A protein has these predicted regions:
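N-terminal, charged low-complexity regulatory/assembly segments
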Residues: 1-126
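Short acidic, hydrophobic short linear motifs in intrinsically disordered regions
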Residues: 202, 211-219
């Protein structure tokens, strides 16, 4: 066996052991004390990254539940990127998979995770330079076609995600959904605003058909 291939297999064995030491034996001839350092270092890096990006979830969940969730993500999820800013999005994909598998996570967990991720996603989003100002036609604003900025996201949730906290965790979602407009201003600050169902629907219509005038959108 050539040395590069042998090294590659050793690296894979080490990586599998670090991710799931209970199911994968370590490479031979490596002292467990040294392996323990790597196991703790790698896991703590991932846990710290997720805790920093999902602070409300981290605050709500008990330590054991949170660490078990992170451990499952660390052990089971195959990330599609090596970029650290994309790891929170991978965590959301992991939660989606858990829903499909019937895992008994809190009912609000997926939506709260998405809500917390949005701030990072919008903070890193690139502005669409091709966007134009409103195309004013005639003297009436109703005859103007508007387009929605790529840095303004209308979002709808079953749960009041902007209010969830250790002191406010309803057993069931309210009868009315929560609608939010999340936007990034020119100073790169992200803002969250609660909006009505009517405004949410109007923003959806503008996003779906920016070529239509306001008058056409309302008819």
């Amino acid at each position: 066996m050539q040395a590069p291939e042998r090294l590659r297999q050793q690296q894979f064995a080490l990586a599998k052991h670090i991710r799931d030491p209970e199911a994968n034996l370590p490479p031979p001839d490596i002292e467990d004390r040294r392996l323990a350092i790597y196991r703790e270092l790698f896991f703590n890096n991932v846990e710290g990254l997720l805790a920093g990006n999902f602070p409300v979830i981290r605050e709500i969940l008990d330590d054991d539940i949170w660490l078990d969730l992170v451990r499952a993500f660390y052990r089971e999820h195959l990330c599609q990127t090596h970029l650290f800013p994309e790891v929170p999005r991978e965590f959301i994909r992991f939660l989606e998979t858990r829903i499909e598998q019937g895992e008994q996570d809190p009912a609000w967990l997926m939506e709260l995770a998405h809500y917390e991720w949005v701030e990072l996603a919008l903070d890193l989003a690139e502005n669409d330079e091709a966007e134009n100002d409103a195309n004013i036609v005639g003297d009436s604003i109703l005859d103007t076609a508007f387009s929605l900025s790529s840095l303004a996201w209308p979002l709808g949730y079953q749960w009041p995600v902007h209010r969830l906290s250790p002191g406010f965790l309803p057993e069931n979602p309210p009868s009315e959904p929560t609608f939010l407009l999340v936007r990034r201003d020119r100073d790169y600050k992200v803002h969250f605003e609660e909006i009505s169902a009517l405004i949410f629907r109007l923003l959806q219509l503008i996003s779906d058909a920016p070529e239509l005038t306001a008058r056409q959108q309302l008819t």
